Design a protein with these regions (language model features):
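Membrane-interface alpha helices of multi-pass inner-membrane proteins
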Residues: 271-274, 323-336
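Transmembrane alpha-helical segments of multipass membrane enzymes and assembly factors
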Residues: 5-21, 38, 42, 71-72, ...
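Active-site lumenal/periplasmic loops and adjacent helix-entry segments of GT-C-fold
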Residues: 81-84, 91-289, 294
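Hydrophobic, membrane-inserted alpha-helices
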Residues: 7, 33-41, 148-153, 268, ...
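Membrane-interfacial entry segments at the cytosolic side of transmembrane helices
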Residues: 46-52, 76-83, 199-209, 315-317
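Hydrophobic alpha-helical transmembrane segments
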Residues: 23-27, 82, 86-90, 212-216, ...
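Short hydrophobic alpha-helices at membrane interfaces in multi-pass membrane enzymes
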Residues: 301-330
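Membrane-embedded, hydrophobic transmembrane alpha-helices
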Residues: 1-80
């Protein structure tokens, strides 16, 4: 519903995409409507309740369609491409939901904290909600990711015990289909540019394969740590103990040990498997939306590859894609302040 409601706005931001931003409209609807409720609640203008969330969503959807009817002229989306994206999204949503079922308990790492924040926000009508550990004080944390999960929970009249895992599997699905869409259009634009110069026939094989590869790289792949430490070193008999999958995020500065120079790299698929619904996890789909907006801006600006770009700061800053990306980067300071 959010995707349909915000489709006119997305179509204005992705005019040269085959689906006119259909898949991105879902994320756009979540981030804009959720932030509107958060902002109104933070100023004490409205309570954080399901009716208020639904009214806010309804007003924004109405504004999107009024804007679309009177201000935007776009071509209809290509249904075949749109359906391909929907099938991929649903397939990976089912896949990640199935995997989440192997360890559904909110136990270990930061799952209890994430679950606790969500339950506190479900009980509360104020923004921020009362801290579950520091009673009498509001949550003092970058809790935007959990807030969006609770926002979707309230507008669907469900409970955290049902939506905790559905939120993380939805993000994992977006982590596949949004890179697929971006890379598909990148590869196709490259192929069209080559055909214009050298001639030949247009093929969809390379764009589709490129999209599947990039989607798999973000949603499923990680790094080469398991290949080296879990397979090769194990086969050579160099590992002293059994392989522990979180080690793949803790080897820079850890192996070999380097004092005062260590880092933790929690790539998306690690977090999806681990089960934390933390800020950096939910923010993955918002970051991909920013990347899509930036590519849409480039694709929309560079209509003639042979023509030299004439940059004007004023023109750049007034482009809708840049304005939307600026808004999202501002949201990141609340949703993932890393």
């Amino acid at each position: 519903v959010l995707g349909i409601g915000f489709y006119p706005a997305a179509a204005a931001l992705f005019p040269r995409f085959h689906d006119r931003g259909w898949m991105f409209s879902k994320v756009l609807g979540i981030v804009v409507s959720g932030f509107a409720v958060f902002a109104l609640g933070s100023f004490g203008l409205v309570p954080f309740t399901a009716p208020v969330c639904l009214i806010t969503v309804g007003v924004l959807i109405l504004a999107s369609w009024i804007f679309g009817c009177f201000k935007v002229r776009v071509h209809a989306p290509e249904i075949d491409f749109l359906m391909m994206e929907e099938v991929l999204f649903f397939a990976f949503f089912l896949l990640w939901t199935y995997l989440a079922g192997f360890h559904p308990e909110a136990h270990g790492t930061e799952k209890f904290m994430d679950y606790g924040f969500m339950k506190a926000m479900m009980r509360s009508t104020a923004v921020p909600a009362e801290d579950l550990w520091y009673s009498g004080s509001g949550i003092n944390y970058y809790y935007g990711g959990q807030f969006y999960a609770v926002f979707l929970t309230k507008i669907t009249f469900t409970d955290v015990k049902q939506t905790y895992h559905l939120m993380r599997t939805m993000v994992a699905s977006f982590a596949f289909v949004l890179p697929f869409s971006i890379t598909y259009h990148l590869a196709e634009s490259r192929a069209c540019h080559r055909i214009r110069k050298e001639g030949g026939n247009k093929s969809q094989i390379a764009p589709v394969l490129g999209g599947l590869l990039s989607g798999g790289a973000v949603s499923l792949a990680g790094n080469m740590h398991y290949v080296i430490y879990g397979c090769i070193r194990q086969w050579l008999g160099l590992n002293e103990s059994a392989y522990w999958f979180p080690s793949s995020t803790r080897y820079i500065g850890y192996d070999p040990l380097v004092e005062n120079d260590r880092t933790i790299h929690e790539f998306p698929s690690y977090s999806f498997v681990l089960g934390d619904l933390h800020a950096h996890v939910v923010n993955v789909m918002f970051v991909l939306l920013v990347l899509g907006l930036l590519y849409s801006y480039v694709k929309n600006t560079c209509r003639d590859p042979e023509k030299e770009w004439k940059w004007s700061l004023k023109d750049v800053l007034l482009q809708p894609q840049i304005i939307a990306a600026g808004f999202l980067i501002g949201v990141f300071h609340w949703s993932n302040y890393w």
